[in-house]
Amino acid sequence: MSGAGRPEYTVDAQGLTLGVVATRWNAEVVEPMLERALAAAEQCKVAETTVVRVAGAVEIPVVAQELARTHDAVVALGAVIRGDTPHFDYVCQSFTHGLTEVALRTEVPVGNGVLTCDTLEQARDRAGLPDSKEDKGWEAAVAALDTALVLRKLRDARGQRDGRPRPTTT
């Protein structure tokens, strides 16, 4: 099991906002992941969660970028299942690169909860279903919120928030 050894934890994200972008493709896998991501946000005491739907994985990065402008953390959810053509590889490379670019350019963490699996069964096994071995929706949400808190702490320590100098009082 690839999830062996992963930490089970939540964070106190009270006051943080979370943007979630989820695909419509492979709904039987994505919907439970979305439910679990929202449950994680609630347990972490997120102040506000916005959910946006897109067609597929290639559309995720541009919407994640827009969410990053108004949220403390973003989560991307979807499932790309390998087919008989190289399209799978192009899609996976495209959205993965896009999500990394969004996080680096906006300085807002993006939790990657987009499954890239050879089979639907592999995706179901990671979707947080009652019989799943893993819970990638939950994990992606907590990871994004945790990273947002780490960034906030680092920025506060040097007198900055959101990458901008904070005003000093005299």
From Swiss-Prot:
Keyword Iron-sulfur set for record: no
GO cellular component, one term: cytosol
Coiled-coil residue spans: none
UniProt: (2S)-2-hydroxy-3-oxobutyl phosphate binding residues: D84, T85, R126
Gene Ontology BP terms: riboflavin biosynthetic process
Top EC class for this record: transferase
Protein name: 6,7-dimethyl-8-ribityllumazine synthase
Gene: ribH
